[in-house]
Swiss-Prot record:
A Pfam family per the record: Flu_PB2_1st
Source domain of life: Viruses
GO CC list: host cell cytosol; host cell mitochondrion
Keyword entries, A-Z: Host cytoplasm, Host mitochondrion
Tagged with keyword Aminoacyl-tRNA synthetase: no
Annotated compartments: Host mitochondrion; Host cytoplasm, Host cytosol
Organism: Influenza A virus (strain A/Brevig Mission/1/1918 H1N1) (Influenza A virus (strain A/South Carolina/1/1918 H1N1))
Protein name: PB2-S1
Function: May participate in the inhibition of type I interferon induction through inhibition of the host mitochondrial antiviral signaling protein MAVS. The knockout of PB2-S1 has no detectable effects on laboratory infected mice.
């Protein structure tokens, strides 16, 4: 309040006003800042002062024949004085209004075809159902998601060739349309866009939207298919979520879903054949999804799912270094380890042969209802930061992390024999035996883990062996974060701060 009063007093003095309005800006650093480079430094300000001028627009001389000098109200639409430095005409914003109302009209037949993705979005929203709104803590995880519903999954290069062929067919340049989908789309679009008067550049932009998968790395708490991502801002905030059912499906989400189902079936069949790799590759090559060869889809499609990754790896494609354990996707974000077989004794004196990971590693763990950051050394959990929807989800994540850490106190917490089998009645491997055991009852595990006093860190809280929260004590190395924990994209490396326990998220 004092500051405002002081400013008011200053502004009431005529000298202040004079200094602010009359003095020139002659400081070289300021001039340099606003004049170096072609990039506009303050677009909003520029637009404001341009629009305050009488003729902020320049146009080609032909405008003088097409637009009257004055409108019906007698306001001048363009000035006879030339734009300094070019032979263009200075034009008023009112001329745009005149043109929109009285300018030539053209056939609208191509608009729904060019702006197809927008029209389809409107339809999906019109037929979608919204509500109710729930207020609760949202656990969001950054995931790589598809933000462009309805696209045909072409690669950027394939799409570029199609666009050039459709929009600029006479331009020189080698364009080889090889894939089935490229040829079909090109033929379809050429027919649709005959005699199209919309600017070629606009057509090219819209075609790109229609042909290429665009992905972003966004915090998501619910559905990750593109029809949910397009309404992300309507369905989830920091402390609320709104239920939403999309008013239609799109081809790319169907393909993603079908790809997962096909890959799972293929992997299942291949595992029981005499030569799993050869049989898997043969099936991938002979399978089609929506009329497109599965191998072509696998090359383009970024869906991260276990069976899909197995098929990609078999084809020699790059996959992200993630793996599943206990219903969580683990992604190593830093560190490395070597595997070594080791025999350990459980609390029941049963001998287990486990493959020990030697070395320091950091992982993100992503499950359906909880996420975590795990830092571990050889058979030792250093730190676990968990975030989850409820006590049950947090407990699940803690159990998985404790088992994954391979700590001795976890193995010693086993009571009774480990003899879990899978559906085919085969014994599970030792790590899964341990996991099943503690998923049934984790009381001894939590009690034996040990507790420690904790520092008061914002957004973080301790958790006791009986799963009650505490601000003073916590199970050793374990903290609960009120914010979500981010999943990493396979392409994005994010530096982790290894300094202190007190970082709730590595970003």
């Amino acid at each position: 309040m004092e500051r405002i009063k002081e400013l008011r007093d200053l502004m009431s003095q005529s000298r202040t006003r004079e200094i602010l309005t009359k003095t020139t800006v002659d400081h070289m650093a300021i001039i340099k800042k606003y004049t170096s480079g072609r990039q506009e430094k303050n677009p909003a300000l520029r637009m404001k002062w341009m629009m305050a001028m009488k003729y902020p627009i320049t146009a080609d001389k032909r405008i003088m024949e097409m637009i009257p000098e004055r409108n019906e109200q007698g306001q001048t639409l363009w000035s006879k004085t030339n734009d300094a430095g070019s032979d263009r005409v200075m034009v008023s914003p009112l001329a745009v209004t005149w043109w929109n109302r009285n300018g030539p009209t053209t056939s609208a037949v191509h608009y729904p075809k060019i702006y197809k993705t927008y029209f389809e979005k409107v339809e999906r929203l019109k037929h979608g159902t919204f509500g109710p709104v729930h207020f609760r803590n949202q656990v969001k995880i950054r995931r790589r998601v598809d933000i462009n519903p309805g696209h045909a999954d072409l690669s950027a290069k394939e799409a570029q060739d199609v666009i050039m062929e459709v929009v600029f067919p006479n331009e020189v340049g080698a364009r080889i349309l090889t894939s089935e989908s490229q040829l079909t789309i090109t033929k379809e679009k050429k027919e649709e866009l005959q005699d199209c008067k919309i600017s070629p550049l606009m057509v090219a932009y819209m075609l790109e939207r229609e042909l290429v998968r665009k992905t972003r790395f966004l915090p998501v708490a619910g559905g990750t298919s593109s029809v949910y991502i397009e309404v992300l801002h309507l369905t989830q905030g920091t402390c609320w979520e709104q239920m939403y059912t999309p008013g239609g499906e799109v081809r790319n989400d169907d393909v993603d879903q079908s790809l997962i189902i096909a890959a799972r079936n293929i992997v299942r069949r291949a595992t029981v054949s005499a030569d799993p790799l050869a049989s898997l590759l043969e099936m991938c090559h002979s399978t089609q999804i929506g009329g497109i060869r599965m191998v072509d889809i696998l090359r383009q499609n970024p869906t991260e799912e276990q069976a899909v990754d197995i098929c990609k790896a078999a084809m020699g494609l790059r996959i992200s270094s993630s793996f599943s354990f206990g219903g969580f996707t683990f992604k190593r974000t830093s560190g490395s380890s070597v595997k070594r077989e080791e025999e350990v004794l459980t609390g029941n004196l049963q001998t287990l042969k486990i493959r020990v990971h030697e070395g320091y590693e950091e992982f993100t763990m992503v499950g359906r209802r909880a996420t975590a950051i795990l830092r571990k050394a050889t058979r030792r959990l250093i730190q676990l930061i968990v975030s989850g929807r409820d006590e049950q989800s947090i407990a699940e994540a803690i159990i998985v992390a404790m088992v994954f850490s391979q700590e001795d106190c976890m193995i010693k917490a086993v009571r009774g024999d480990l003899n879990f089998v899978n559906r085919a009645n085969q014994r599970l491997n030792p790590m899964h035996q341990l996991l099943r055991h503690f998923q049934k009852d984790a009381k001894v595990l939590f009690q034996n883990w040990g507790i420690e006093p904790i520092d008061n860190v914002m957004g973080m809280i301790g958790i006791l062996p009986d799963m009650t929260p505490s601000t003073e004590m916590s199970m050793r190395g374990v903290r609960v974060s009120k914010m979500g924990v981010d999943e990493y994209s396979s392409t994005e490396r994010v530096p982790l701060h290894q300094s202190k326990v007190e970082c709730s998220s590595p970003l």
